[in-house]
Design a protein with these regions (language model features):
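Metal-dependent polysaccharide deacetylase catalytic core of the NodB/CE4 family, i.e.
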Residues: 1-66, 89-96
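Generic serine detector
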Residues: 20-22, 42, 57, 64-65, ...
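Terminal accessory/targeting
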Residues: 23, 97-187
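Weak global preference for isoleucine
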Residues: 5, 16, 35-38, 44, ...
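Glycine-centered structural positions embedded in regular secondary structure
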Residues: 48, 78, 142-146
Length: 187
């Protein structure tokens, strides 16, 4: 409740984040509807806390280039739902995060996660991360910086065809290309 949020907000190590008003798939909204949804939540934050959070987390980790642009105009940072370690090479409007919850939150896993190294990359394609009929399957290419720890041991997994499996990858020195075998199923 808001009293608990206000209590947390007083702690010096806590940042309250924005996650939309409806917690629906923003990519399914018309442009004006997703903007209204964000603005509704922002109005509530301003009324209850006296400010709008600087952090945004995309509901279900989904966003389009248009949504990302709106968020980048109104927030300082945003998080997807892809796992990874934040470092200086990451786009501050596509930050990775690890789920820590009742299913994925035991102490052993937490200790493992805080000791991970980031995969630092120069280029990540495609720019439009939202998969539609016209770009399914996407062509996914990552160009890494050189001299990274264990980079040759990289593996990728995807749920193409609605079943999780190890992805086909080509890894040539520092460029990784994912060659998806099947189209992704839509929800």
């Amino acid at each position: 409740n808001w009293e608990q949020i206000k209590e947390l907000d007083k702690a010096p190590f806590v940042q309250i984040g924005h996650h939309s008003h409806s917690h629906n798939y923003l990519v399914d909204f018309k442009n004006e509807d997703f903007i209204n949804d964000i603005n509704t939540a922002s109005t509530i934050f301003n009324k209850r806390l006296g400010y709008n959070p600087i952090f945004f987390s995309y509901p279900f980790g989904e966003y389009s280039s248009l949504i990302k642009k709106y968020i980048s105009d109104n927030f300082k940072f945003s998080f997807g739902q892809h796992s990874g370690v934040i470092d200086i090479t990451k786009d501050r409007y596509e930050l990775p995060r690890f789920p820590i919850n009742e299913k994925y939150g035991d102490l052993k896993r937490f200790k493992f996660l805080i000791n991970l190294y980031p995969l630092q990359y120069k280029v990540l394609h495609p720019d439009e991360k939202y998969v539609t009929i016209s770009n399914n399957p996407p062509k996914f290419i990552v160009e890494f910086f050189e001299k990274q720890k264990n980079i040759n041991n990289i593996n990728c997994f995807s749920d193409e065809g609605d079943k999780w499996k190890k992805s086909n990858i080509d890894f040539n020195q520092k460029i990784l290309t994912l060659n998806f075998r099947e189209k992704f199923k839509f929800r």
